[in-house]
Amino acid sequence: MDVSAAPAPSEKIGRYRWVIVSLLFAAMVINYVDRQTIGLLKPNLSKEFGWSEGDYADLVFYFQLSYAIAYLAWGKIMDKIGARWGFGIAFAIWQIAHIAHAGARGLSGFIFARMGLGVGEAGGFPGGIKAVAEWFPKKERAFATGIFNAGTNIGAIVTPLVVPGITLAFGWQMAFIVTGVAGLVWLPIWLLVYRRPREHKKLGAAELAHIEQDPADPVEKIGWAKLLTKRETWAYSLGKFLIDPIWWMFLFWLPDFLGKRYGLDLKTFGPPLIAIYLLSDVGSVGGGWLSSNLMKRGWSINAARKTTMLVCALLAVPVMFASFASNVWLAVLIIGVATAAHQGFSANLYTLPSDVFPRAAVGSVVGIGGMLGALGGMVFSKYIGKVLEDIGTYTPIFVVAGTAYLVALLVVHLLSPKMEPVKI
């Protein structure tokens, strides 16, 4: 037995792994500033370019199409070249594509830029999950995932703080250029800091032993064909298919809902959106913390993850009635709790691949699930565009949002009733 990494009994476990999470967190902040800018500018861009609800739905659709295709590929790429270069390449692609929005002169130009953004951003979560699988033991992964996933909410908070001011002062083109160029600062830091744990000079023996405390995974190449025969692959992927579209809806249509229902505009979106995504942060970190805490108390992975997911699914149900809220702040509370529930649910669903699959397969399973999630988003975006054009109300859309998480949990439980390690 190799004991070279074993610490002395009195040696304190280091915390360098949390530096890695902080970098992932920062990347997700940038990711969501880039992703959400279009949703915040929808009313202005629709007016300037004469977009219909169907045109905007197409814009979202093609972003998700490229995201779906690329997500599958990124999972495999992360397994092949690792999180350092895989994440770095993905980041560079999405930042360049974000800046390219400034050159769009019509719907086709925006679609082209959005598709480039989708290709790059699709690598964000497979890379993040891969990095967490490399740097954390199973009992800490949901919490670590929740922390870096909380960066998406901070990005969603930063966007209404920054983008309206830039847009009103310098025009919408500069909103894309300024945020894109500023975000590029992250890339060299990531490439300088990130290494696999055993290759990292700043990692102590105690922390390395802590990271590697789980039984070693068998080292073998695992193809998609084999993964697609596993029920756990479909548990994760169908869960993503059902819940990812709800988050896409919040991200791309929430400013439009607040504008149409409560008369908000680019100058007044800020406080309600910030409140919603602050609540989302609580859910992201809280969902990961709850399941990790239950496991520390002796609960099984299966019981801890699914109990947390059930709590989150129930908290999402009231969003069905968001359209009926009598004032904007009641709507903000209802929607904010639902977005928090989504993030808590997601933090635990995201860990399913690393909980049950060998590390060599994690990126590929995450890629398959991400592709299914984006495909679900494509279907839902078309549905949203159709509903808004034909009916003009968000009520049917919120009804779907309120029920999706309970259905997703049922599917996950039926396909992976025990969340036991998969035999490859």
What does each of the following model-derived ranges do?
Residues 39-69:
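Extracellular/periplasmic helix-loop-helix junction of adjacent transmembrane segments
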Residues 36, 64-72, 156-157, 277-281, ...:
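Residue-level signature of mid-helix packing/kink "hotspots" within the transmembrane helices
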Residues 38-39, 231-287, 342-346, 350, ...:
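Extracytoplasmic gate region of multi-pass secondary transporters
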Residues 69-108:
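Conserved MFS/SLC helix-loop-helix module at the cytosolic interface between two early adjacent transmembrane helices
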Residues 113-153:
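Cytoplasmic helix-loop-helix junction between adjacent transmembrane helices
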Residues 50, 82, 103-109, 137, ...:
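Helix-breaking motifs and short loop linkers at transmembrane-helix boundaries and internal kinks
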Residues 92-105, 310-326:
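C-terminal ends and interior cores of transmembrane alpha-helices
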